[in-house]
């Protein structure tokens, strides 16, 4: 997840306040990415750390940047795909799956989901 200081998604109702952190949003996105066919791992967003990580519980936020705008959410995903899959179809499926999961869980519109293919795994 991005190291940027981002404001949590906050909603105020007569019963109280609901605050969802960018890390929680990244967790929802990570779970959706894990369910996507053809994705075998996440890659760090920065180029300093070029080691690709296979999706594991402790690394699930790696390769996910969450940007919370006033009335919507934008997400950047840095993924590694399986060799032999059609990149455009996998990316479109990831976009649809993540958008649906975030919208369903948060009830807030998702403005963009950007998929950055950082590598292809051949094994």
Q: Residues of each region from the PLM?
A:
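C-terminal structural segments of small proteins and small subunits
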Residues: 96-112
């Amino acid at each position: 997840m991005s190291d940027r200081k981002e404001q949590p998604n906050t909603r105020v109702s007569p019963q109280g306040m609901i605050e969802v952190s960018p890390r929680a949003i990244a967790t929802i996105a990570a779970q959706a990415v894990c369910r996507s066919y053809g994705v075998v791992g996440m890659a760090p967003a920065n180029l300093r750390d070029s080691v690709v990580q296979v999706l594991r519980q402790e690394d699930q936020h790696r390769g996910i940047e969450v940007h919370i705008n006033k009335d919507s959410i934008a997400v950047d995903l840095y993924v590694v795909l399986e060799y032999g899959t059609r990149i455009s179809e996998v990316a479109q499926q990831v976009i649809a799956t993540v958008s649906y999961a975030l919208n369903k869980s948060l009830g807030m519109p998702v403005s963009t989901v950007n998929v950055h293919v950082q590598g292809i795994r051949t094994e």
